[in-house]
Amino acid sequence: MTEHDALIEAAQQVRENAHAPFSNFRVGAALHATSGRIFGGCNVENATYGLTVCAERIAIFKAMSEGERNFDAIAVVADTDTLTPPCGACRQLIWEFCGDIPVILANLKGKTETLQMHDLFPKPFDSSNL
């Protein structure tokens, strides 16, 4: 099993914990730290949609809360026919906390695609803009 396969599997597993009673759109993410640790996250919806948190952000926040600061890949899995890339807010956080890492997109049908973060987020707002 490759590192990317392991991340996809971890994202698939954590996706099962998603709380999506309104959209039924369950997403899992798995973030790989350079230490070798994998941090999973699933989306958590709220009746006030603005309080909903995406799987990618939860994975990042979980890793950060446990002291990790260096990451080299993230996988995002959803049960869709097409692949589901991170939303704009997640792209901003991935860029700021992870940099130009590979983003592995996968669905439950076995389709995958790996993109570099700079392809998903070509003109980021970051500390150089401040």
Locate each region found by the language model.
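Conserved beta-strand segments that form the floor/walls of ligand-binding pockets within enzyme
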Residues: 26, 43, 75
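Feature captures the catalytic cores and cofactor-binding loops of soluble hydro-lyases/lyases
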Residues: 58, 62-66
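Short Gly/Pro-enriched turn/cap motifs at secondary-structure boundaries
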Residues: 19-22
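Hydrophobic "anchor" residues
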Residues: 37-38, 112
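C-terminal binding/interaction regions
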Residues: 2-17, 66-130
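General beta-strand structural signal in soluble alpha/beta enzymes
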Residues: 40-41, 105
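Short beta-strand scaffold segments in enzyme catalytic cores
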Residues: 24-33
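Compact, glycine-rich, soluble single-domain proteins
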Residues: 42-58
